[in-house]
Amino acid sequence: MKNNLNIKDVEIYYEKWTDEYIDSFGEIFQALTTDSNEELINYIANIIDIKDGMKILDAGCGTCGPSILIAKKYNVNIEAITISQKQLSYSKANINKNNLNNKINVIKGDFHQLKKYYKEDLFDVVYYLESLCHSPEPHEAIKSLNDVIKPGGLLYIKDLYRGPDIPGKLETNDYPINAINENFCLKIQTIGKILDILGINGYKVILCQRPKFNEVFDKGNAFTAKHNIKLLKNQDGPWIDKGLVFLNWLEILAIKHY
């Protein structure tokens, strides 16, 4: 696993690659998707049980694709934060194009330092949609979240994790995980570490599961093929499929318990 990742690396990465992500993924940068963006976001909103009137934080918002779809469907107030100036510019343009300036506010900032930007006990819901994996220190990210989420607030994390290691064959996971970290500016964790961090910070996990929708990896595979990114030894063909052993996509829903 890459150990020297810092938040500046992530900023530089997305300043360079955001246009390419938009070209390949559209406005939702997620490797695990389903048959349509609307279906994906409806699924996530239903799992969280988003309701009108909620105050929501989109932590690591990309170009605000998910938040725009949520704000179109619900009467909510969304604060969105990205580390990238380029993503901020795209987000503002997208929000304006969809006439959602009264529902979504986006800023450039570091989601490890949320109290610099937001009031205490502000949010009913916080979500990280394949964004916490960019954190050099996920414990610091969740600790920062404690300052701004309400007691009883809901936290949703959809992310990729290191798969279970095969005894005597650690390189089976080590090589692709290291390659993914290096190529996509990530620091992939085990699910056990993230669950421990949540427990230490006072979150009660309501569910932890593989997302229950038809899994589609076409955009991620097309992106890596287009840019000739090789993540497997002797790779010949798509690197993502439903039978991966070195990666595990999971969703977590937790409540701020204390």
Specify the residue positions occupied by each region the protein language model found.
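N-terminal, positively charged/glycine-rich alpha-helical extensions of SAM-dependent methyltransferases
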Residues: 1-28
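Conserved alpha-helix/loop element of class I SAM-dependent methyltransferases that forms part
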Residues: 34-52
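Conserved class I S-adenosyl-L-methionine
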Residues: 53-62
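Class I SAM-dependent methyltransferase SAM/SAH-binding core
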Residues: 66-113
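A short acidic, Gly/Pro-enriched loop at the edge of an enzyme's catalytic core
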Residues: 115-126
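A short glycine-rich, Lys/Arg-flanked "PGG" loop and its adjoining helix->strand segment in the class I
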Residues: 139-154
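Short, glycine-/aromatic-enriched active-site segment of Class I SAM-dependent methyltransferases
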Residues: 161-184
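Short alpha-helix
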Residues: 186-201
